[in-house]
Every structure is written in structure tokens, then in C-alpha cells.
Amino acid sequence: MILELDCGNSFIKWRVIQAVDATIVGGGIVDSDQALVAEVGTLASLRLSGCRIVSVRSEEETAALCTLIGQAFSVVPRVAEPAREMAGVRNGYEDFQRLGMDRWLAALGAFHLAKGACLVIDLGTAAKADFIGADGEHLGGYICPGMPLMRSQLRTHTRRIRYDDASAERALTSLAPGRSTVEAVERGCVLMLQGFARTQLEQARSLWGEAFTVFLTGGDAPLVREAAPQARVVPDLVFVGLAMACPLN
């Protein structure tokens, strides 16, 4: 079995797969290293043969997690590293090491699945878009605040905006103009995300016409499904690229 980890700024997404055929044994999202070890340890018949990690954390934080994983499960984690070129994709950043590893691996995974030009829209803490040409050239992308950041900024800097997560969820049953603060904030943020997605689609069409594949990934991908009905929703797109960057079989 292989433990795969996607370590973001706020959460760790994890899954355990069979080494032979990549069948998913279990998975989840946690908010701390300790919670990760506890959750993975509850899997029945757990026998890890390896671990691979993609991380946007600092080197020190990533190293600490690798040590913890090694102590808990007796495996040596492999951490994905930036590359100028891999699996037919050429990193488009002027300094290739500065491209976030989550974006790089999502680009690898998307190009592998699309076998041609593709647009990746990743909606998590940040909203990100990346363009990969039919020849594998990464053309660059965009980053802006995602739903969690927009929401937290409004809550933090506007004293009268206070509501809980349950209220936020109820507010998203419609996108009609809000008749309460929670509805106005939540629906406004969703419309901004949808506008972001539509703009990326326009950009992609200006580059490739209709000859491209759209991928939606990240926890808030369902919120923009309406804006990109032709998109393929691939929640584990980063893990597709991670397996390519860190083969363990």
C-alpha cells in the first residue's frame, strides 16, 4: 500500500492506495500532522510499502512531517521536487523552482489525461488556473483568493459580518441576490469564482478555439460547475501527477 499526501496551506489531503492497481483503500482531509497519523492508523490491515508527498509548506514543516510519517509507519516518504520538464510537460515559469508544486503536479496529471491542450482550474484556499498547450508547454496561469480566503477576509475586516458554517451552507441553495448578510457574502463570493472560471475559459478559447480539455479540481470545484459545464471534475488530479513525479512501483 502507498500513502499519498497533498499538504496545502490549511489542510492535508490524504489517501492510501494499493500499490498494484492504485485501488483506493481510504482517504480524507485533516488539519494537522497528528490528526493525519491518527486517521491513517485506523485503516484496517494497513501495510504501507511507501509514501509520496507533495507540499507547499516550508522545507522545515515538510521535513517534520516526513519524520513523523517515518516514525509512525516505518516508511521513508518521497517528496515531489520541481522540474524544468517532466512527462512531456515543460515548466513555463522563468524560474521553474518557483512554480507551486500543487500546480505543477496538477499540470502533469491534466496533460497525461487530456493527451493535448488543457486548462486546469483548481479551487481551494486559493483559486488557480494553468494553461498547458498541445505540445506540453506550460503557458503560465493565474492565482487569486479562493472561497475560504474571500470569506475570511470579509469576516475579519468587516465587524458586522458574523455567521457560522451551517448558515453559509444554507445560503448557497440559490444564487439570487442575498436578503441577509450571509446570503450576500456567500453568493457574491461564488459569483466571483464563477467569473474567474469563465474568464479562464475565454482565455483558453482565444488560444486554442474549442480544441482543449477543462479540468476542475479542489474542494470548491462544484461551485463553478455551472460556469464550466464541459469540464471534467477530477478531485485527485494532483495525485495523478504525484504518481508520475514519484513512482514507487
From Swiss-Prot:
Active site: 102 (proton acceptor)
Enzyme class: transferase
Record-linked Gene3D superfamilies: 3.30.420.40
Entries under Pfam families matching the protein: Pan_kinase
Main location: cytoplasm
UniProt cross-references to InterPro entries, sorted A to Z: ATPase_NBD, Type_III_PanK
Cofactor: NH4(+); K(+)
Pathway: Cofactor biosynthesis; coenzyme A biosynthesis; CoA from (R)-pantothenate: step 1/5
Subunit architecture: Homodimer.
Name the UniProt record assigns to this protein: Type III pantothenate kinase
Gene name in the database record: coaX
